[in-house]
């Protein structure tokens, strides 16, 4: 069938057909068609949407994302035909039925995800089927390798190449801003690709973007790493393991965190950047992805097993996850706190200790320190000022201004301090609620938004003492965040007396006890 192009300014992928043309082709909404241009010779497969009013019969509406591949012009005539059904759908159905997928099955699924052959609903079917029928280690390895093969890779002549990762779930976990410069200052290479926040108040890429650009190609990442020893960039711009982002997008609405896919996601990125040694942070706590030490050890063994299959040395640290790391949550607040540590501040101790522990593991794995001595070496590098100098070098090589300090970072101009309404001790911090408040205040999109904790577990408070301060770039967002803070009450303060249980019976003076 020949149809005349009408370009539609919609960012999504897809094409729009009149009902009658769709009927003539024998397709329904959601089916695939092949569009080819006789002018350029380009062709692509995309999904059909139908209408009776938005497009005239004989015309085809081409969305922006689709036209990026075809470069069609308005009123150009194109050829349209029904596309073949992807064989990868059979493999997804196979997983739905509880069968084990082969390496070739998984390679076909991942290739179709990357090439946009599978629709979002079909990718969701793969995600859900892998969630219900868990991937085993063979499938996880196959998924990891397929993710790597379908994207760009880095290749360094010198080694060992170091990387680190945190599986997330803890607010304020800004340790990459300290770990990366410590590792790079030791003489090792660490090409750190990081994520943006999906449900959090700031991913590492969101934080680094306060100071420097974070979107680079894989070749640029490699070049900058060789020049300075390390980078902190957004992985989504590198085309490293591109299937991962497409899978994560489909996981998000269901709040699915499928363990096998998570392990493959992490390790694919590490393998693709050429990492020889990897330190993995697994926070453990009631508000974390991992709730118990036993669960954490099981997950760690899976990471280590996969590392051995991929010829990478992996070690995992089970870390305390029942409170934020440091006191700051939100891009500029966290950058300010990380810079203060790099500049020599002795607090917050949780941030310093965790950063040095993770950096220390990496230094030991890479042969820079004996076992058990890595954290001390990391602290020595931090205290010497070498890590700060290296961090400023990283900012510069990524196109930022290295003339920066913690004092120069300004946070949201609108703020409100939540205070204790009674005397007592902090007995609980709800990480989920703290993140919700920070996001309501505008983080991570508004870089100055977030919150700062004045009190953490065990802090003694008198009535009226500050518990945390909310910051926002916009007043209306601050007002919304205050409402959330009052509703959620994320910090629990209790005295030694939890409650009184009264005797509700009336007491009569002089009444004798019944001894019968």
Curated annotation (Swiss-Prot):
One of its GO terms (molecular function) is pentosyltransferase activity. Keywords: Glycosyltransferase, Transferase. SMART domains: PYNP_C. Its EC number is 2.4.2.57. AMP binds at residues 169, 195-200, 204, 265, 289. The active site is at residue 257. InterPro entries: AMP_phosphorylase, Glycosyl_Trfase_fam3, Glycosyl_Trfase_fam3_N_dom, Glycosyl_Trfase_fam3_N_dom_sf, Nuc_phospho_transferase, PYNP-like_C_sf, PYNP_C, Pyrmidine_PPase_CS. It comes from the Archaea. GO terms for biological process: AMP catabolic process; pyrimidine deoxyribonucleoside metabolic process; pyrimidine nucleobase metabolic process. The keyword Transferase applies. It catalyses: AMP + phosphate = alpha-D-ribose 1,5-bisphosphate + adenine; CMP + phosphate = cytosine + alpha-D-ribose 1,5-bisphosphate; UMP + phosphate = alpha-D-ribose 1,5-bisphosphate + uracil. GO terms for cellular component: cytosol. PANTHER family: THYMIDINE PHOSPHORYLASE. Catalyzes the conversion of AMP and phosphate to adenine and ribose 1,5-bisphosphate (R15P). Exhibits phosphorylase activity toward CMP and UMP in addition to AMP. Functions in an archaeal AMP degradation pathway, together with R15P isomerase and RubisCO. Belongs to the thymidine/pyrimidine-nucleoside phosphorylase family. Type 2 subfamily. This is AMP phosphorylase. It comes from Methanospirillum hungatei JF-1 (strain ATCC 27890 / DSM 864 / NBRC 100397 / JF-1).
